[in-house]
């Protein structure tokens, strides 16, 4: 096992464990027949090339990565509606299996690029052969519309190294505004949407019972 494998193994363990736990939250809502504020959960460990690039840009030595780079372990929690994000953040604050050490609200404080999301930095303990180890992880909570925009912007940022042509920058700004308006409109009819989803779920369950 090389140096990078040894370094990243605890992060992979943390992501795997956190995905199970956070997905379990959604399942608990479903079992209780309550509407879940969580649409789905994803997770990943930052690629080695991305870690090296970020470390070089910020002057972080290898032996300080575990303390100074908080997003090597990353998770995303998707919500249907903007106000679901506050619910999810409150749930994370109340967890006893990890410690919230920092929060960054890019929804009320939108980045200049148009990026919107809520970031929660946590310290998560894992058990290893050498004892307990504390891992920093970043949980991003956002709506589906926010995620669509962020995914496209992330891809373009790599292509242009963050220096967008004026036309691309203009279109990204317009797309960010459109994503914001979509979230606003969906929030206005949230009750109707959730009622329809509940009706569909119940109807599908009855169909399976009769099959």
What are these regions (language model features)?
Residues 1-2, 31, 35, 66-68:
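Nucleic-acid enzyme cleavage-core boundary/entry regions
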Residues 1-29, 138-211:
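An acidic, glycine-/histidine-flanked metal-binding catalytic module
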Residues 8, 32-41:
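Basic, low-complexity intrinsically disordered segments
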Residues 9, 13, 46, 50, ...:
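Charged, alpha-helix-enriched surfaces in structured cytosolic catalytic cores
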Residues 15, 19, 23, 52, ...:
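Generic solvent-exposed, charged/amphipathic alpha-helical segments
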Residues 66, 81-186:
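Long beta-strand-rich cores associated with HINT superfamily self-processing modules
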Residues 77:
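Residue(s) in the substrate-gating loop at a strand-loop-helix junction
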């Amino acid at each position: 096992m090389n140096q990078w494998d040894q370094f990243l193994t605890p992060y992979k363990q943390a992501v795997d464990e956190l995905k199970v736990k956070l997905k379990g939250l959604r399942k608990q809502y479903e079992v209780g027949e309550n509407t879940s504020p969580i649409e789905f959960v994803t997770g990943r460990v930052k690629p080695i090339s991305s870690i090296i690039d970020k470390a070089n840009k910020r002057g972080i030595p290898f032996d300080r990565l575990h303390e100074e780079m908080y997003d090597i372990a990353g998770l995303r929690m998707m919500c249907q509606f903007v106000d679901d994000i506050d619910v999810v953040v409150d749930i994370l604050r109340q967890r006893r299996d990890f410690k919230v050490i920092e929060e960054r609200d890019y929804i009320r404080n939108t980045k200049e690029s148009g990026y919107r999301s809520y970031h929660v930095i946590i310290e998560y303990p894992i058990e290893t052969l050498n004892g307990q180890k504390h891992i920093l992880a970043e949980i991003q909570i956002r709506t589906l519309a926010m995620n669509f925009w962020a995914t496209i912007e992330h891809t373009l940022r790599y292509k242009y190294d963050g220096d967008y042509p004026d036309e691309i920058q203009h279109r990204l700004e317009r797309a960010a505004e459109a994503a914001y308006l979509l979230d606003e409109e969906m929030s206005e009819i949230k009750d109707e949407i959730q009622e329809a989803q509940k009706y569909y779920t119940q109807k599908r369950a009855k169909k399976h019972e009769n099959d």
